[in-house]
Amino acid sequence: HLLNVLTGSIGTEGGTSPSAWNKFHPEFFDTPPSPDSWNELNWPKEYTLSHYEMSQILPHLIKDGRGDLDVYFTRVFNPVWTYPDGFSWIEMLSNKKSIGCHIALTPTWNETAFFADYVLPMGHASERHDLNSYETQAGVWIAFRQPVLREKARRDGQDIKFTHEVNPGEVWEEDEFWIELSWRIDNEGDLGIRKHFMSPYRKGKKINIDEYYQYIFEQTKGLSETAKKEGLSALEYMRKYGAYLVDPEVYVKNKSNLDNDEMVGTTIKNNGQIEKEGAVIGIEVDGNNFSGFPTPSKRQEIYSQTVVDFGYPEHATPGYRIKSHVHLDEMDKSKNECVLLPNFRLPTHIHSRSANAKWLTEIAHKNPIWIHTKDAKRLGVFDGDLLKITTEIGWFVD
């Protein structure tokens, strides 16, 4: 990336672009406030540079006495099978003091669902609503996934309130499930939850699934105008076509000018940063007020103050100085210490979520030990050998 910065090829034709430029970001009818506290079971202090929540070590955090969970939803998630330390998950999910109530939202019966208090069938792609948008090109597009049988029933003239009325096996549509659950939890409206699920079209009424997506599509740039040319609403257009190209070309967005309304109430600092209500919204360059890049400073950042603030000043600039605790230099070959990769993912195993798909299992029905040829030669190991692997937490035979 630094090379692209130095050659001026960020956001240009033939260059690279920030992913945020080419992915659609919907505007919702309501945005609840963010949590007012830090959840150390999701984001432990030891892993301040992690990009995602550290769910793989959740059982160990709870076992260490850092907290417990009253209610835990596992959504299309099978850690007992997928994660390396599945038995720790079994221990946690079996302990009422660790997990008060475990609900498994899953399209298939699996190892984790076995330890759930409630197993709620989750719809596959053709049984639920969803929005899709990926950075596939220098443009922005949005796609609409919708339950097949619900849309067929609508076209057949049926009045469907909930998707589970027509879904196979009465499977609930996920968006509808969360709306209904949230609404019923705050039955009297005194918990401050219901107000975030009010219809933007029917005052005081609960939002329904059609209104949920109708609002998003009506706020999508150019979609209503395109739909109107065919005598359709934005929602009807997306039901019919399933996709819409929001912007065919997205280049040099960092040079987009802030308009007069955006500049009202701003101050320009000596370093060129344009601030409004305490936030940096753009950058002033040679008298031009640009929106800049999607970074805290609105510039390309080589130095990260965030990393410094989290206590890692040695990593504030780009480099390759992070040495893992499982680096080869840390291994004692005399004790047969190796880098352990207990599981891996073949294409046919689909995120390790398809253990009970017998046809895929027949295609790839082995989970062999992968070992470097040099280590295999040193240990006298050959293809087809049955080995016992021992670690600090147990052993397995494969």
Task: Label each region the model flagged.
Residues K23, N132, P313:
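Short Asp/Glu-rich motifs
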Residues E27-N39, N110, F115, A316-I322:
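Charged, low-complexity, helix/coiled-coil-prone segments
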Residues P18-H25, P32, E127, N288-N289, ...:
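Residue-level detector of alpha-helical segments with a strong bias toward transmembrane helices
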Residues A20, E40-Q214, G292, V339, ...:
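Non-catalytic alpha/beta scaffold blocks inside enzyme catalytic domains
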